Amino acid sequence: MYTLIWSPQFTRTARNFTKHHPELRPRLAAVLRDMERDPFQPHLRFHHLGGKLEGIQAVRLTYEYRITLTVMVTEKEIILLDIGSHDEVYR
């Protein structure tokens, strides 16, 4: 099991995200549960980012929305950084 750590930015954006997309609350809860179990499950589409976001990873919430994060494998911690549309989180 991994520990999810909500950064202040993720807490803020997740609150706003779920306010504007209440239909995605169950999907977000399911993705976070799956990430706690194993963030490398194929259906999460875990991937490393490049360029100015090098060192950050992302998982897919839906086709349009992503969650950016940092995984510290040695401590089994996942630091949640941002949530939003593809363009919003990869800016």
Where are these regions (language model features)?
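Enriched for short, Lys/Arg-rich terminal
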Residues: 3, 12, 16-25, 61-91
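Short alpha-helical linear motifs
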Residues: 30, 51-54, 69-72
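A short, surface-exposed loop/turn module that caps and links secondary-structure elements
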Residues: 33-59
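PIN-domain endoribonuclease scaffold, especially VapC-family toxins
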Residues: 25-33
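Basic nucleic-acid-binding interfaces
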Residues: 2-9, 46-49, 54, 91
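Compositionally biased, intrinsically disordered/low-complexity regions enriched for serine, proline
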Residues: 5, 19, 36-39
